[in-house]
UniProtKB/Swiss-Prot annotation:
GO terms for cellular component: cytoplasm; nuclear speck; nucleus. The gene is zc3h14. Belongs to the ZC3H14 family. This is Zinc finger CCCH domain-containing protein 14. Its main location: nucleus. It comes from Danio rerio.
Length: 669
């Protein structure tokens, strides 16, 4: 049991060294938690789920390494002992990842030997050989260990290994020195955690570079004696890619003073690599809790706090690793066109213009703000007067979408100058910059063109444009406005008074409307609004059942009245009042509620009975309620009335006294 506890401590120290290598070691809580998971026989997936909060991206590497170590110990324990004196050697080679300069793979060999006397000998040795290639060296290491089989105990969480009386000397080359014991009861067990530089093939790694090794220090070891040592190395500068080999060695001697600590570090590096930073930490004695288990702090709370801290750190670091892309809002139903598309359109038009014009064509490109203009002057065939070809393209940043229309370029004839309406739009250079930008889709009117005039078609298909949503009325209006705006410009450009004016063809994908054009459009809009009939500020008496809808000249309320029921306008109010529950049957003249059905009479009064002097002949026996004849009103005092001029009716038969009107039960004999 003592040896098993020592092996558990050795595994714990190796786990601690591995955590320090990954930079995830904080205190003893995490190694304790991992040892508990090992004791509970957690599978790699469960360990990866539980340790992902602590190790992050190194979780898979750690779990593969840990289960590789446990699998080796388990395979040694399960292997049956040999009956003969022969020694069975089983070697398992685990290739490690190659470095950037093509280092040799490291091989790990484990040999197990057993004797007839059921004695177990544990000896682990490793030697790091350096093979140089192009000024860089890697150290292939071979680990050989002879281990006695262990008895499986399902209830125990540690592995027991009985010590042998002596150790074997195992060497693979004359350079390797083995650790030999002069005492028969000494047991040497050493485990090393070798840290390697990550390579491109890190995804293929199936086992980590954990090895149990026996590293000798040569003849100096015999002078210093045998001491148990524990070493954990940590690379403080992660930018250095030098491999660091750290050995953790614990030696148990039966007749010596006890356990001692020694730092064993063998680092042989080339000039290409810098000196690796190393930190040697002596193993601390096992802490014993001073409080009973009932009063100790709950480890789950500590682990939860650590996980929350790690999660917050991951969140803060991930915010800066992922670049944030700024998104620019784009208007709906438009698509931002790249500069290449607009330049391609310009080049396409230029090529066709070169085909139509002579070689001495003058190219003059002007860029104003977001609009680019290409002006070409072409000499006339007969009159030798220059013809100006002007191409204006509004860039994508202004249009936010290219036009999908197809337009035709025609060479103007000498006899017939092209009409002014063939322009899509014009820009007055002397005016101020526009305050608003509007999309114009002017229709090219059908013109009779001779068959001899060449033409070519430039189409921009596949690009959505909001220009198609314009109505014909708007396009005609803007076409007329463009015509009026082009007239002054043509008068300024023409220097001759001949009947044949200078033809100019303006081809544009889109254009701006200047302030003058905007003012004219606004005036036309105002006139159109004034042409409509204004609604009268009076509530529609047929509302809410009015059939005219929005065309009704009267006001239809659409907002709740805020002063109801204290509104003094009643049914004349321009706001909505709740419906009256009596609706058309309501007889209240000033009812503030809304009546959906039309009331028959806003102030109904009952018809007064006709005043007739004819006394009903059936009086006072008449039973008809609405009898049109006169029924005298009886006097309340009846025969007791003492007024001589009483106008009420006094019946001739006296009314019996009150006592006579009382009913009494007849007594039965």
């Amino acid at each position: 049991m003592e040896i098993g506890t020592e092996i558990s401590k050795k595994i714990r120290t190796a786990i601690k060294g591995k955590l320090q290598e990954f930079g995830a070691y904080v205190d003893e809580e995490l190694p304790d938690y991992i040892m508990v998971m090992v004791a509970n026989k957690k599978n790699p997936q469960q360990m990866a789920d539980d340790l992902s909060l602590f190790l992050g991206n190194n979780t898979i590497k750690f779990t593969v390494w840990l289960h590789g170590v446990l699998e080796k110990l388990r395979s040694v324990a399960v292997e049956p002992p040999s009956l003969g004196p022969s020694v069975v050697h089983s070697e398992t080679s685990i290739p490690a990842e190659n470095s950037r300069r093509g280092a040799e793979p490291r091989a790990l060999a484990v040999s197990s030997s057993r004797s007839d006397k059921a004695e177990g000998r544990v000896s682990s040795s490793a030697h790091e050989n350096r093979a140089s290639k192009r000024g860089s060296s890697e150290r292939p290491s071979r680990l050989t260990s002879a281990v006695k089989p262990l008895m499986e105990a399902s209830a125990e969480a540690v592995i027991d290994i009985k010590p042998d009386l002596d150790d074997d000397l195992i060497s693979y080359d004359p350079v390797e020195h083995s650790l030999t014991s002069g005492h028969s009861q000494a047991l040497y067990s050493r485990s090393t955690a070798e840290r390697q530089r990550p390579a491109v093939e890190s995804s293929r790694r199936t086992a980590d570079t954990y090895r149990s090794s026996d590293i000798s220090r040569g003849q100096d070891r015999s002078e210093r004696g045998y001491r148990s040592s524990a070493e954990s190395s940590r690379d403080l500068s992660r930018k250095r890619k030098a491999p660091v080999a750290s050995s953790v060695v614990r030696v148990h001697r039966g007749h010596e003073r006890g356990l001692e600590i020694e730092d064993l570090e063998e680092e042989e590096e080339d000039e290409d690599y810098g000196l690796a930073s190393k930190v040697s930490l002596p193993s601390k004695p096992e802490r014993k809790p001073t409080l009973p288990p009932a009063k100790q702090a709950n480890k789950n709370l500590i682990l939860k706090a650590i996980s929350e801290a790690q999660e917050s750190i991951n969140k803060t670091t991930s915010q800066y690793t992922v670049p944030q892309r700024q998104t620019v809002p784009v208007a709906p139903r438009t698509r931002s066109a790249s500069d290449e598309m607009s330049n391609a359109a310009i080049r396409l038009v230029q090529e066709h213009l070169h085909a139509l014009t002579p070689q001495d064509t003058l190219h003059n490109t002007q860029s104003r703000g977001l609009a680019s203009r290409l002006q070409l002057e072409v000499p006339e065939e007969d009159s030798r007067e220059p013809h100006e070809y002007e191409l204006q393209v509004l860039e994508a940043a202004r249009l936010k979408a290219l036009d999908t229309r197809s337009f035709i370029m025609r060479q103007p004839e000498v006899e017939q100058p092209p009409p002014i309406r063939s322009r899509l739009s014009a820009v007055n250079q002397n005016e101020n910059a526009p305050t608003t930008s509007r999309m114009v889709q002017a229709r090219e009117r059908a013109e009779a063109v001779g068959g001899s005039s060449p033409k070519f078609i430039v189409t921009l298909d596949g690009v959505p444009s909001p220009l198609a949503n314009r109505t014909d009325q708007e396009m005609e209006t803007e076409d007329e406005l463009n015509t009026t705006a082009d007239l002054p410009e043509n008068n300024n450009n023409n220097n001759t008074t001949t009947t044949t004016s200078k033809p100019a063809v303006h081809l544009r994908l889109g254009a701006d409307l200047r302030n003058a054009c905007d003012d004219e459009v606004e005036e036309m809009d105002i006139e159109a609004v004034q042409a409509k009939r204004q609604k009268l500020p009076e509530r529609c008496k047929f509302w809410p059942t009015c059939k005219s809808g929005d065309e009704c000249l009267y006001h239809h309320p659409n907002t709740q009245c805020k002063v109801f029921p204290n509104c003094k306008f009643a049914d004349k109010c321009l706001f909505i009042h709740p419906n009256c529950k009596f609706d058309a049957k309501c007889t209240k003249a000033d009812c503030p509620f809304t009546h959906v059905s039309r009331r028959l009479n806003s102030n109904p009064t009952r018809a007064a009975p006709a005043l007739t002097s004819t006394v009903c002949r059936f009086f006072p026996e008449c039973k008809k309620v609405d009898c049109p004849f006169y029924h005298p009103k009886p006097c309340r005092f009846a025969t007791q009335c003492k007024r001589a001029d009483c106008t009420f009716y006094h019946p001739a038969v006296a009314v019996p006294p009150r006592s006579a009107l009382k009913w009494t039960k007849t007594q039965s004999s």
